[in-house]
C-alpha cells in the first residue's frame, strides 16, 4: 500500500524527521490560502499521486506569485498525470501539496527497503540525488552505498556515520543524518514498511538536512490483518486499479496487463506458467488472476466478471488443477458465471485433478459454447486460435 507524499511527511513529522513547511490543498483557493499562510515569495506546488517521476512529467513546479499558484493548481486538479511509472491513462490528481520555496545547496538520495537476499532492512544512499537517481542506479551503481541492518542489533550510529561520509557530509550534518536514519529505521519497523525513500534529501543553504520528498510503501499484509489501523485509514483507492480493488474484496489475486486473453488460474506458479505458454504460442495475457485454493462458485463468478470488465479481453483461458479446489466446483462456477454475465467471447477450459471427469461432464452437458482442452499447450493454442478467428 502506497502513501501520498503529504501523508508520508506527516509520518516523518511524528518521528522528528525534518520536513519543509507545507499544506495539502484540494482546490485552487485552498492552494492560494496555503501560500499565504506559508509567506515568502516562492512556493512549490506538487501533484499528489502514487507515482514517481512527477517533476519530469510536469506535476511539480516552482512558482513566484499567488496567481501562478492558483493557475497551476487549477491545471492539475481533476486531470491525470502520466509519468514513466504510470500506464498511458496516468493517475488522477485530487490534491496538491503547497510548500515553501527553499535554498537548496545539495540534493542527496536516502532510502531503505527489505533486501530479500540478505533478509534484512537495507539502507541505500547516494550523493547524486534528485530526478535522475534511476539513471544513476542503472549507469553508475557504484555511486550508491548500501548498508544492511542486523535485526538483532538494530540500526547503529556508526552505520549512519559511514553513510554520512559516503554522502560527503561534514560537521553537524553527520549527526543530523544519523538521527534521520535512526528515525527511518524506527518507522520501518513500527509501521511494517516494505520501502521508504527520501529523494531528494537536501542540504539547505544554511547546512541543514531536510526531507524534500517522501515515498512510503507499507506491507499490504500488515494492513489487511489490522496491525496498522492508522495507515489503513490513509488508503486512497482512487490511485489503485479499479479491477484490482474489486479483486481484493473477493480475496482474488489480480493484476491488470496489456493483452487481450483473460486468464483464470488457481495457483500463482501455474498462473505465471499459463501466461508464459500463452505468450509462447503468440497470445498476449490481459491479466494475472489466481483464484486461490479455497475457490467457491461465487469467487469463480466474481473472477469472470473481473476479466470481462476489461474492454480489451477477446478470449478467456481457464486453467485449473484440482488439488485443494475440485474441478466440479470450478465447472459449476463457470456455468453460473457464463449464465449471469453473458460471456460473448471464446472461452477455453482446461481442467485436471480432483473430480475432473465430473467437471468436464458438467461443462459438456451445460449446452454452452465452451471449448475443452486436454492440456496447457492445447489450451493455449486453442485460445490464441479462437481469438484470431474472432478478430
Swiss-Prot record:
Its EC number is 6.2.1.5. GO terms for biological process: succinyl-CoA metabolic process; tricarboxylic acid cycle. Mg(2+) binds at residues 199, 213. Signal peptide: none annotated. Pathway: Carbohydrate metabolism; tricarboxylic acid cycle; succinate from succinyl-CoA (ligase route): step 1/1. GO terms for cellular component: cytosol; succinate-CoA ligase complex. Its cofactor is Mg(2+). It is an enzyme of class 6 (ligase). It comes from the Bacteria. Substrate binds at residues 266, 323-325. Binds 1 Mg(2+) ion per subunit. Gene3D superfamilies: ATP-grasp fold, A domain (3.30.1490.20), ATP-grasp fold, B domain (3.30.470.20), Succinyl-CoA synthetase domains (3.40.50.261). It catalyses: succinate + ATP + CoA = succinyl-CoA + ADP + phosphate; GTP + succinate + CoA = succinyl-CoA + GDP + phosphate. PROSITE patterns: ATP_GRASP, SUCCINYL_COA_LIG_3. It holds the Pfam family Ligase_CoA. ATP binds at residues 46, 53-55, 99, 102, 107. Residues 9-246 form the ATP-grasp domain. GO terms for molecular function: ATP binding; magnesium ion binding; succinate-CoA ligase (ADP-forming) activity; succinate-CoA ligase (GDP-forming) activity. Keywords: ATP-binding, Ligase, Magnesium, Metal-binding, Nucleotide-binding, Tricarboxylic acid cycle. Heterotetramer of two alpha and two beta subunits. Succinyl-CoA synthetase functions in the citric acid cycle (TCA), coupling the hydrolysis of succinyl-CoA to the synthesis of either ATP or GTP and thus represents the only step of substrate-level phosphorylation in the TCA. The beta subunit provides nucleotide specificity of the enzyme and binds the substrate succinate, while the binding sites for coenzyme A and phosphate are found in the alpha subunit. Belongs to the succinate/malate CoA ligase beta subunit family. This is Succinate--CoA ligase [ADP-forming] subunit beta. The lineage of its organism: Bacteria, Pseudomonadati, Pseudomonadota, Gammaproteobacteria, Chromatiales. The gene is sucC.
Amino acid at each position: 500500500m502506497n502513501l501520498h507524499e503529504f501523508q508520508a511527511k506527516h509520518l516523518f513529522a511524528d518521528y522528528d524527521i525534518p520536513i519543509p513547511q507545507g499544506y495539502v490543498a484540494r482546490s485552487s483557493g485552498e492552494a492560494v490560502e496555503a501560500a499565504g499562510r506559508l509567506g515568502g515569495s516562492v512556493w512549490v506546488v506538487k501533484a499528489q499521486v502514487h507515482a514517481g517521476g512527477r517533476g519530469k512529467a510536469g506535476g511539480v513546479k516552482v512558482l513566484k506569485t499567488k496567481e501562478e499558484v492558483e493557475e497551476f493548481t487549477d491545471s492539475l486538479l481533476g486531470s491525470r498525470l502520466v509519468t514513466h511509472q504510470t500506464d498511458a491513462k496516468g493517475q488522477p490528481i485530487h490534491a496538491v501539496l503547497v510548500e515553501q520555496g527553499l535554498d537548496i545547496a545539495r540534493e542527496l538520495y536516502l532510502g531503505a527497503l527489505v533486501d530479500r537476499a540478505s533478509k534484512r532492512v537495507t539502507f541505500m544512499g547516494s550523493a547524486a540525488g534528485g530526478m535522475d537517481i534511476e539513471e544513476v542506479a542503472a549507469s553508475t551503481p557504484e555511486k550508491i552505498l548500501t548498508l544492511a541492518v542486523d535485526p538483532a542489533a538494530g540500526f547503529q550510529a556508526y552505520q549512519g556515520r559511514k553513510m554520512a561520509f559516503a554522502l560527503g557530509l561534514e560537521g553537524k550534518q553527520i549527526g543530523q543524518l544519523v538521527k534521520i536514519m535512526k528515525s527511518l529505521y524506527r518507522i520501518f519497523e513500527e509501521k511494517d514498511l516494505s520501502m521508504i525513500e527520501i529523494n531528494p534529501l537536501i542540504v539547505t543553504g544554511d547546512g541543514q538536512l531536510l526531507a524534500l520528498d517522501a515515498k512510503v510503501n507499507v506491507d499490504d499484509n500488515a494492513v489487511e490483518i489490522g496491525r496498522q489501523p492508522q495507515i489503513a485509514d490513509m488508503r486512497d483507492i482512487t490511485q489503485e486499479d479499479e479491477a484490482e480493488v474489486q479483486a481484493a474484496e473477493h480475496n482474488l489475486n489480480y493484476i491488470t496487463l496489456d493483452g487481450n486473453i483473460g486468464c483464470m488460474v488457481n495457483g500463482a506458479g501455474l498462473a505465471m506458467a499459463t501466461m508464459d505458454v500463452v505468450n509462447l504460442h503468440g497470445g498476449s495475457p490481459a491479466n494475472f488472476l489466481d483464484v486461490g485454493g479455497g475457490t467457491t462458485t461465487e469467487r469463480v463468478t466474481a473472477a469472470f466478471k473481473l476479466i470481462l470488465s476489461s474492454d480489451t479481453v477477446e478470449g478467456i483461458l481457464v486453467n485449473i488443477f484440482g488439488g485443494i479446489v475440485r474441478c466440479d466446483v470450478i465447472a459449476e462456477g463457470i456455468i453460473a458465471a457464463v449464465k449471469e454475465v453473458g460471456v460473448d467471447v471464446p472461452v477455453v477450459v482446461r481442467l485436471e485433478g480432483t473430480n475432473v471427469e465430473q467437471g468436464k461432464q458438467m461443462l459438456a452437458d451445460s449446452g454452452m459454447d465452451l471449448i475443452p482442452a486436454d492440456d496447457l499447450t492445447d489450451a493455449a493454442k486453442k485460445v490464441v486460435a479462437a481469438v484470431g478467428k474472432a478478430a
